[in-house]
Amino acid sequence: MRLFHEAKNKIRRRGVSTQQVVESLHTNASAALELPILHVETVALCVVKYTTPPAAALELKDLISTAASELWKPSSVFKSGSSVVTLDTEDRQCSEYNLSKDYLTCHPEDPLRRAGSAIDNVMRSVMNDYRAKYVMHAIESSYTVLLKYDVGGHFVSHYDAARSAPRAVSVTCFLNDDYVGGELYFEHLNITVKPSPGLIIVFPSDYPYRHLVTPIEQGTRYSIVKWYSYV
């Protein structure tokens, strides 16, 4: 009972009702959320798409959008090649939640705990495959960031590596597609990736792989991003 009340209080602070907490604890207690890799496609040098079940991705989106409803904050960004973190909405306009910081301390049936575990599992499989193809050295990631782009949300052309963030590999997982806009465009490769639930794209973090997110015209775009650095 004590664990139930701890979970209830923690999740209610996120704007989730007691009924939703009860449903989470009883309905989802033994339900592991899995995103197995169904298909792998190389679309350009070192740019690889991984397809996972759309239904599982949509369930993950529902977990995140509910459980993190009170936790979103304006997204910050490193200026490319610098050590400066900025909240400049002219460059990037979206909300984020760093799931890595606390989901492992959540109650086992907390929706964010389930989401974090599912993300870790699929990313481990994806990166094992990608590293076998392209990366010689060991890599690791300590960040799992949830992103929410509302109408008008965007991210100008950029690359992910910076002096104080020496990233080697970038990963984006799309959770839904019921919105207009929000495409991922690689400027130098002239490749547009149209989001679909469960699609994961992996690519190097440096300059040749500059990319942008086109403005959201309608709806809300949910995604997960991770960055990996050499150990």
What are these regions (language model features)?
Residues 1-23:
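Membrane-proximal basic amphipathic "stem/tether" segments
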Residues 2, 152, 160-163, 167, ...:
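Catalytic core of Fe(II)/2-oxoglutarate
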Residues 16-134:
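Non-heme Fe(II)/2-oxoglutarate
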Residues 49, 145, 169, 173:
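Conserved, well-structured core segments
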Residues 50-53, 149, 174, 206, ...:
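Structured loops at beta-to-helix junctions and adjacent beta-edge loops in soluble globular domains
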Residues 133-144:
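A short coil-to-beta-strand element that immediately follows conserved catalytic motifs
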Residues 133-134, 156-159:
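Charged, surface-exposed interaction regions in soluble eukaryotic proteins
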